A protein has these predicted regions:
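Second-shell residues forming the walls of enzyme active-site clefts
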Residues: 2-136, 146
Length: 148
């Protein structure tokens, strides 16, 4: 099973399918209200939240935030499994699919989901990501090692 939406969705009041939820709470409140249920979770997989936590990373949503994925999910919550993005075509993300996907992978997501069923978007995304660079090889190797 996949635990979602890490690092937490409780303080968000908007639906990320429709628009970007913005949370202005400080990290201490978020830790005890949203993040704590994910600490030492017994799951090999988690799905990220498309939420902007302004007091943690004012520039990037959790899915695309190196600060949140590395410092909170990996270090503070001690999650060592596979991190999967939520659907990269959701309205919470305002940029194009390629940009959103690359940013999520660069931030630390191991897999990026594209789930809206639009085959033209999927084709565009796959064509633009088809060049296997060193970064993609590293991510693929991490996934392979995890699944072994």
């Amino acid at each position: 099973s996949v635990a979602k939406h890490i690092p937490g969705h409780g303080c968000a009041t908007d639906d990320s399918h429709k628009k970007l939820p913005i949370v202005n709470d400080n990290i201490k409140k978020l830790y005890f209200k949203d993040f704590l249920p994910f600490k030492n979770i017994n799951s090999h997989f988690v799905m990220t939240a498309h939420i902007l936590y302004k007091k943690i990373d004012p520039k990037f949503v959790a899915t695309q935030s190196n600060v949140i994925i590395k410092n909170i999910i990996r270090k503070k919550l001690k999650f060592n499994g596979l991190i999967i993005s939520d659907d990269i075509s959701m309205k919470a993300l305002s940029k194009n699919l390629v940009y959103n996907s690359k940013l999520a992978l660069k931030a630390g997501c191991n897999l990026v989901l594209h789930c809206n069923g639009n085959i033209n978007e999927t084709t565009q995304l796959l064509k633009s990501l088809n060049k296997i660079d060193d970064f993609t090889k590293k991510k693929t190797h991490q996934l392979y090692e995890f699944l072994r």
